[in-house]
């Protein structure tokens, strides 16, 4: 009996010590850089629902708003924007929790809230309507905007939209503290980001050290880790069923044929569910169509928006 009690006590002490070690690992120093030190000449900020939202504005003509995907930023549009500024006014923004925008630790990061934030952004810049362009998670966000305020949407352009697939594994939703934060730390390491990008690009040569470093910059801004942890716990395993059939705006869907991001059946399903939508397949291209095939994307956008 005494031996059993000692074993149980030893096990309990061991578990407590392990838990304390995990907490220490989760909260190891995480160096951050103030956003103000990262601002360039093209960067602008505007308050939306009490949050500072980062965006850029370039060009002249019909208005296009570009919305990045999960763990992305305005950086993903660096090749696309210069090809459109002659004929379009391009707004590229960082959604809440990413890029240089605010990252409240307890923010509302579900796609409906992000879609509403996009409407708030348009209100703030006094833009009545625009064509919305969304990549991956951004495709879901702009769809939510269309559902909430169809009169504000001229057309939708969805690039590898993240419908019906989980942003992160479902088990993360049930991870107890502090394992959730440890997983978030791991996701925001350079090695993980490199692996993520290499798995998403068809042309691996485009995933250079410079590109990886640029993608890492927003992960080192204040509250980035806290926001990601909250995001993964609250919305990471949602698949957003039932949204596509309610979309009313003219919609263009682009799919990279060699990507691991969005399976072909998802693109085809969306095409069948969104009434009157057009599906364009991009050959020899992965998940990041805007970075691998910007010229083809621009051609498709011009033909669709004209």
Model region roles, listed by residue range:
Residues 139-150, 156:
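Short glycine-enriched nucleophile-adjacent loop
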Residues 247, 253-255:
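Short beta-strand/loop motif that positions the catalytic acidic residue
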Residues 48, 56-58, 92-133, 299:
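Active-site loop/oxyanion-hole signature of alpha/beta-hydrolase fold enzymes
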Residues 18, 30-34, 168, 172, ...:
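Conserved alpha/beta-hydrolase catalytic His-Asp/Glu region
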Residues 51, 56-100:
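Conserved HGGG/HGGXW glycine-rich cap/lid loop of the alpha/beta-hydrolase fold
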Residues 1-62, 87-88, 128, 305-306:
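Alpha/beta-hydrolase fold catalytic core
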Residues 147, 156-185:
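Flexible "cap/lid" loop of the alpha/beta hydrolase fold
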Residues 277-306:
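Catalytic active-site module of serine/aspartate enzymes centered on a nucleophile-bearing elbow/loop
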